[in-house]
Amino acid sequence: MTPQELLAELLLKNEKEGRRMLQTDIHIFDGPSLALLVELIKREADRQWNNNAQVSFMLAGYILAIGDLTNNKAYHALGLMARGDALRRMDRDQDSLPFFDASGEEFKEVGDEVGWARTRIGRISACLQLNRTSEALRDATAAREVFMRHGKLLRAGQIDVNAAIVNYELGQYDQALRLFDRAIETYSLQGEGVELNIARALGNKAITLAPQGKFREAVALHEQARGTFAAYGGQEVAVAREELNIAQIFASQGHYSQALLLFSRSRTIFLQHNLQFQAAEVAQQICLCLVRLNRAREAFELAGETVTFFRSSSGHRHNLAYSLMYQAEAATLEGNYGDADVMLQEASIILEEGGFMALASIVRLQQAELYFAGGQLEDSQREAQHVADAFAEQEALPQLARTALLQARIAASTGDINTAQYLCDHALDIAQGQGLLDLKYRCDYLLGQIAERRSDLEAAARYYDRAVQGIDEVQNHLVLDERTSFLEDKGNIYQRAIILALKRDNKDQALIYVEKAKSRVIGDYLRNNIDIRLRAGDKAGEAILEDLVKLREEQAWYSSIVYEAENEANLSDTAIMRIRAIAPEQARKEMQLRERRIEHLLEQMQLRLAGDLVARQRSSWTNSIVTTLWPKLEQDTTMLEYYIAEQDLYIFQLTRKGIDVHIVQDAVPQLERLHSLWRVNLDLAARTAGTQDQAQSFVGLEDNSLGLLQKLYDLLLRPVSHVLDNCEHLIVVPYGILHYLPFHCLFDGTQFVVERLDVSYLPAAALWEICRQRGERIETKKARLSDSLVLGISDNGRLQFAVQEAEVVAKQLGARPMLDNAATASLLWQFGARSPIVHIAAHGLFRLDAPNFSHIKLADRQLSTIEVFNLDLSCCSLVTLSACETGRAVVGGVDEVIGLGRGFLYAGAASLLPTLWKVDDASSAELMEMFYQALLGEYSKTAALAGAQRAFLTRARTSSRPYRVHPYFWAAFHLIGDPGPLL
């Protein structure tokens, strides 16, 4: 039996069986063969560190057994060291120290000075994890001297790297850099075969450069190290570590999407190699990105998971402190100042006890920011001053800039404008020099406020403009919903810029800022043709798609239980059995769990698809998007764009003559009250419709609705009625709560607005040109109306007129209606790309809690917002969603509209006809027949809708059911996007 064969046999045994085999077979090996066997076992034990530390532990036991069986103390010492290394890899650092110490003593006894020095390598790492840094540095000095004396250059370099890491953790960056450089120099003296060692040292040196703000140099070193590891092969974990480090720098600079992409990639590799500890460290870094993107709840929960993980691990106390810091930051963002303070106090104690003063300073900076958020200015100033001195001494420039900005905010809050200016300029200088995007715009914003307080409006306007541009720069590096969440707390910056521009009578500039805050995500993606549709193309992408399909099926199943339980009387026996299989409360939890997983996977896919686009600079949002808009409007067209600041309403009026603005002071409280009453009226109308006494009940409801709609008209349109006198087409660009109001059925005291004007809507004025060009492009294609896709589902008889509506519309278009079981979502993927019209009459559900999962119920699945994004509707002139609340949305960011409509616009549709509330299916069917009749009669889309609504009103007023004049029956439909001709 050869040593190689014995090792192969040992790997198949448990430790007890392996020891018996050694007792039986060890005598057959002579001295050289025995030495080879020990070397092979030790090499395999080292190889198993990252794969299976338990196997490494067992192999160390075999070396110990060989030492005992042969009375060879050197082998026994080697076994002790190997066992210590295995324990360290099992996160049992405290348990590993006695083995390293015993091993060192035995090596000394046999006169092996180098062997003793080798035991210090693992011991230093264990001491670092146990916060015994003085011991670690003492061991490093002694061991290096031994290695150099014996010409063991690789070992000497390794010791220097370990000592440098200890100094880095202590915040002694200059000493750490000197040691890394010495290690690299020592490796180079060795000659060949040191590339991987040098790469590791370069990567660690880069980590030390980052806290000093030397980001470009650090990234270059990480890239160099990553290239070396990738070239050698079999270094997946090492490559992942370098990507993790690059991601940390990207996060510091405000490139959050790039950071999240690399974090996700490295975390996946760590988990694949069962490196739970390293995966938890990556999760910590992800928390930081989530906080910066205002995703506080996600960050808090993820940080909580890492807190639990590191509490259960022996040692690693500074990692626990990191987790507490990130969780505290998320708690602060949510306004839970008390919880955040408790977390920071625990983190501070851990770090100060361990001597991690650099990290302890960051905790104190967080405490200073927490005090400032809570209005404790004196406490905040005290802590900030302390850490400012510490960061200056450490040359930790990013943290120093962050501290200076906080001190500037404190000074500004206490009226010390000169000090605030000085400190903020200092912070901005550092931020600009280091490329700290997130810090730059915040400095410019504060400088704008300072200039405004000094009545230097020109300087204030300049600073505010730079702040807005800074936000744009960060957004350019984000994908989809990350942009929306990032903007959540930026409204005040836009507001100050807008109000100051108006104060300086710069109406164009004010409108530019309003537009920059509105529906930027969909607008930017459409302008830049960024394709984030899910598609197979690589193994990783296909795996994500498979997971998404499975999760989406499960989410839809639980969703059907949650939202159909209320209508059990109308369900099939199968549906009732499904609902009774699990309680709706538990089903809701399961549904929400899968929705979070789906959104996470979608984000990963979007990062993969758009990653290279967010990494490079693109053409940014330009002011000409607004300034060239109004001259292109038709002579008879007026665009009204609304904005809300504090309690005031701003109405921007765009006509071919130019831009004007009217301010309605103290309008917001009235708007909120009237909107609430309007929703109550609609809800009552929905309950009353179809009842036996509906004719009598609607008398009061109609009078009430007219009163509410007239008051809304007085606030929203009467102040600018003079521009409507010569107008035929009104384009409304709402803001905030106004997205939920039907401007076309506001009442002027005599008639509804739609009775004298054609009305269409846009989420943002900047989308007007995009939608108009789409309409013109589709018009030139001369598509056949018979290729239109018309779907109708009665939903087990609950929507009696949906199928009838689809049949009538299909007949008008010369298309084949797809009804009930034939009305599947798969048809949209199969035929949507060549359909000039997509008409869906079905049940819709708006999800206020999760707008990305608002959906239309089709025969084979729920067609949700996230799936609509993946459709190709590039030849579609009009999408009609004749279903409940398909036009409702959640307003996120500053004014980002999130709902089904956004998905259809992204998919390529030129215009959209959704509903603002739960509709009466009989009235909808009647209105749709009138609409398509007008549309096919050469009317534009907006004129056809207005004509249909006028015809409906005329018919209702002269019929036996005059109560149908109530807007509930006819006004839910509104046109979004291109108002022009169909084809």
Residue ranges and their predicted role:
Residues L64-D68, G104-G111, T141-K152, D181-G191, ...:
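Amphipathic alpha-helical segments of tetratricopeptide repeats
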Residues R20, G31-A45, N52-P211, E217-R241:
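Internal alpha-solenoid helical repeat scaffolds
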Residues R616-L983:
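Catalytic cores of enzymes
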Residues P3, Y441, L457-V754, K781-L789:
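Amphipathic alpha-helical protein-protein interaction segments
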Residues K13-P32, M58-I66, I471-L480:
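Repeat-mediated protein-protein interaction surfaces in helical alpha-solenoids
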